[in-house]
Design a protein with these regions (language model features):
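Jelly-roll (double-stranded beta-helix
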Residues: 1-484
Length: 484
């Protein structure tokens, strides 16, 4: 499975590489040679830099990009809070309010969340046919504080229509990982285009403006916004120089720009920015997608999950799920793992994931198919589950029974399936929309999944039992302690 088979053909070309320095120009010779800020950039362009890290960050972690654009970002009217009624943009639910749970509702900076040590699972989320990309985002769970650049937010998006052609969106709150479940995203960014299809992920850095259209109709998927740090590739350790997600398989957009000579000069553009969890809007008389050339290390990218090189045990036991890690965060905040089709060949081994309690919170989603550790039918594409810090979880009772008695032949699992898990070292609070208002939380999750587990313990006869006491009582031949 060196690549996925897509129903929608690719329409853009890309550069490749993760964590590498890139350059691209839509017009030949638009990039300066040997310097960044020439007195007069080529073709009357402006020089603008976007920094994704501190200036003095170590070289391997320094993220910045130089842009050569037609008009600088600063040329816009002042930002104002976006009004609650947006009937002309499809965001109102009819009574002047935003959809409940949407990202732009004031969540009091993640303080109005429910923290509870129970297993949670959600049915597939309904698509909101009236909302565009920005206004379809719903917060499921989160931790941290946006204003101090700490923590992260987990979202589900269910958009039914494209963004207005003259609207651009960016988030000052963090770097966004997009995991598409259904539909197609045609993403136009300041640095070029990304076409994202199911079985592809995309990452949009903090502050990069973009526009999302839906060429194949409604979309649904998952998103993780890192408020601190950026996504990185995990270290490979004993695996050596390659494996899991290889750097060469990440695709980076090439420069593309809106030509101001096409007759649209002077038309108004709406710039929407998420800032500390709130939406703000400004207008300007030129396209924000006017970067003719750029070079740097701070850019959006996408990745085909079918290119993931899976590793596993070829002798015995089920290794830690870290072998499936696709992306990690630079601050050790989160790890993203996927479960693609793979062979299981372990001998004398319970092959599904073992029962587990974890210092990491585990959020799972399903892109397609059926997850091999869940056969109860409750974990479906477009739904999700959350097993928070130190909350027990593992295979459902039917999976345990089946795997305990299975003939251990080489077995291909996950055909036509793709699940993912995002692990975080933070306690995750659940939004009120995810907990109750969405109506998607499965109230019988525990009963359906694990209450069917029964004790199979059989105490052996004639085997010595070791007491935890330093001076255990002596027993007679009947195994009973003598009377005092």
């Amino acid at each position: 499975m060196p690549s996925s088979k897509f129903n929608t053909p690719e329409k853009y070309r890309y550069n490749t590489g993760f964590g590498s320095y890139q350059e691209s120009e839509a017009i030949e010779n638009a990039l300066p040679i040997g310097q960044n800020t020439p007195q007069r950039p080529a073709f009357g362009l402006y020089t603008e830099k976007i920094s994704g890290s501190a200036f003095q960050a170590v070289r391997s972690e320094n993220q910045q990009t130089w842009m050569y654009r037609i008009v600088p970002t600063v040329a816009h009217l002042p930002f104002e809070p976006e009004p609650s009624r947006q009937s002309d943009h499809g965001a109102s639910n009819g009574d002047g309010e935003y959809p409940k749970g949407s990202v732009f509702q004031n969540l009091n900076n993640y303080r109005d969340l429910t923290y509870i040590p129970t297993q949670i699972r959600w049915d597939p989320f309904d698509i909101d046919t009236t909302s565009d990309w920005v206004h379809s985002m719903r917060l499921l769970c989160a931790a941290g504080d946006v204003s101090t650049k700490s923590g992260m937010g987990y979202f589900v998006f269910t958009a039914g229509r494209s963004m207005d052609a003259h609207t651009a969106f960016s988030s000052s709150d963090g770097e966004l990982l997009v995991i598409l479940q259904t539909g197609v995203l045609d993403i136009k960014t300041e640095l070029g285009h990304l076409l994202v299809r199911p079985l592809e992920i995309a990452v949009i850095p903090r502050g990069i403006k973009y526009h999302v259209s839906l060429p194949a109709g409604p979309v649904r998927g998952y998103a993780l916004e890192l408020h601190q740090g950026v996504f990185t590739l995990p270290n490979l350790g004993p695996l050596g120089s390659f494996g899991c997600a290889n750097a060469r398989d990440f695709q980076v957009p090439v420069a593309a720009y809106d030509d101001p000579t096409d007759g649209e000069t002077g038309e108004s553009y709406r710039i929407v920015t998420k800032y500390n969890g709130h939406l703000f809007v400004a207008s300007q008389d030129h396209s924000p997608f006017d970067v003719v050339a750029w070079h740097g290390s701070y850019f959006p990218y996408k990745y085909d999950l079918g290119r993931f090189m899976t590793v596993g045990s070829i002798s015995y036991d089920h290794p830690d799920p870290s072998i499936f890690t696709l992306l990690a965060s630079s601050e050790g905040l989160a790890e993203v793992a996927i479960f693609p089709p793979r062979w299981l060949v372990m001998e004398n081994t319970f092959r599904p994931p073992w029962y587990h309690r974890n210092t990491m919170a585990e959020f799972m989603g399903l892109i397609q198919g059926e997850y091999d550790a869940r056969v109860d039918g409750g974990f479906r594409p477009g739904g999700a589950s959350l097993h928070n810090v130190m909350v027990g979880h593992g295979p459902d009772s039917a999976t345990h029974a089946r795997a305990s008695d299975a003939e251990l032949l080489p077995q291909k699992v996950g055909e036509g399936s793709m699940a993912f898990v995002i692990e975080s070292n933070m306690l995750l609070g659940v939004s009120s929309w995810a907990w109750s208002k969405s109506g998607k939380r499965q109230l019988n999750y525990n009963a359906q999944t694990w209450l069917g587990l029964r004790s199979h313990f059989k105490k052996p006869q004639g085997v010595k039992e070791n007491s935890p006491l330093l001076n255990p009582p002596r027993h007679n031949m009947n195994g009973k302690a003598p009377p005092n």
